[in-house]
Amino acid sequence: MEQKLDLRVIKTQNNIKNTFIQLLHQKDFQHITVQSILDKSLINRSTFYKYYTDKYDLAESIIQDILKEFSFFLDERFSGKEKDDLLPIIKNVYDKSYEEKDILSALWTINTDSIHLYDDMQQLLMDKYKFYMAKPAPANKDLFNYKACIYASLVMTTLKYIFDNNDPNMSQKIIENFNFSALW
């Protein structure tokens, strides 16, 4: 019986999250209210507050899940594999991101003091680059930080480009035509 309850909870939370993402595509975050989420998701107020304290908590919850998965992909990407082994991993990250482009692009539009997914992803890319590429210690720390910044910017710009072109094969085209040796 408890498994049914868990399934209902999952369905309810997914309904709330999906409704929130739909609303982000229709209006700015500041104009979304809990009431608009309730109306569109067809749930009552107590159900919403059972899981989230407000729309900020909802957004942060979704973002934390995304960052956790993104971090996992980055750990795999930096796992010490050879260049030929990396290309399928990198393509997988781009493809998975493309599958989630509606969610990511909606959440990228939020930029508050506490919610800024695009910047968080870029910072995570920089941090992972620095952590994994710092062995052995870089000869020039300033240039090392610059490379980390360029790497993060390149990945985020590539993701945005893939989303904007709305072509499911774009990641393959990029992987085939880009020389990753400079930063990868």
Language model: regions and residue ranges:
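Basic, helix-initiating cap at the start of DNA-binding domains
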Residues: 1-23, 27, 36, 40
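Cytosolic nucleotide-binding catalytic cores of signal-transduction proteins
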Residues: 3, 24-27, 139-143, 158-160, ...
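Alpha-helical structural segments
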Residues: 15-22, 40, 57-77, 88, ...
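Helix-turn-helix
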Residues: 23-57
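Amphipathic alpha-helical segments that line or abut small-molecule/effector binding pockets
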Residues: 83-99, 149, 157
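Amphipathic alpha-helical segments used for helix-helix packing
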Residues: 92-122, 160
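Amphipathic alpha-helical packing segments from all-alpha helical-bundle domains
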Residues: 111-137, 142-149
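C-terminal peripheral helix-coil segments that are non-catalytic and often amphipathic
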Residues: 131, 152-153, 157-184
